[in-house]
Amino acid sequence: DLLLLSAVLMTAALTGCSSGEEDALVSKTPFPEFSEVDIAGDEISSDIFADYDATIVNFWNNGCGSCIAEMPELEELYQDFKERNINLIGVGTDSGESREQLDTAREILKEKGVTYHNISPDPEGDFYKDFVADISTYPTTYIVDSEGNIVGADIVGNVKKQLDTVETRLALITGQK
C-alpha cells in the first residue's frame, strides 16, 4: 500500500510540474510596448506583433561575437519562418547610443546579409530604460505571440542550438509543428 501511495504521489507531482511548465509557456506576460526606428531609419512599433502569428525578438549588441556569428543562421530561420507567418526582429541594443554605434551595426548587418528588421532603441526612451537595459547576457531571445505576449522564459545563447525550444513555443502559439 505504501508503494502504491508513493507511486500515486510521484505521478501527481510530475503531472503538476509539467502542467505548471505549460501554464508558464502560455502565460500572458506582455512584451513592452515600443515605438522606435529600425537600423534603416524606418519607424517600427510593437503593433507589428499583430501582423504575425508569432515573432522572434533577438537582442544583440555590436561587441557580442556570438551574436554576430549567429546572424546568418537567424537570417536562414527568418526566411524559413516567413512562410509560416512567423517574423523575426533584431534589437541592436547599443546601436542607438551614437552615430558611430549605428554605423557599426549597419556594417555588421550588411556584412552578415541580414534582411529582417533590426530596431535601434533610443537609450533615453522607456523601451530601453524599462526593458532593454535589464538584459545582461547576449544574445537573448524572446518569443512573442500576435497579442504581444511573451511565451516562455528568455532564450539565452545561440537560437539555432535551441531550436527545439523555439519550435515548441511556436507550436503552442500557432498550432504548427
At which residue positions do the language-model features occur?
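Short active-site neighborhood of thiol/selenol oxidoreductases, capturing the structured segment around
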Residues: 45-68, 74
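C-terminal motif of bacterial Sec signal peptides marking the signal peptidase cleavage site
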Residues: 12-16
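N-terminal "domain-start" segment that seeds a small globular fold
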Residues: 19-47
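Thiol-/selenol-based redox modules, centered on thioredoxin-like
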Residues: 143-177
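Bacterial N-terminal signal peptides that target proteins for export
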Residues: 1-3
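Solvent-exposed loop/turn segments at secondary-structure junctions
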Residues: 61-66, 93-98, 122-126, 150, ...
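Structural microenvironment flanking redox-active thiols in thiol-disulfide oxidoreductases
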Residues: 69-112, 123-129
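Short, internal strand/loop/helix patches
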Residues: 106-140, 144-146, 155
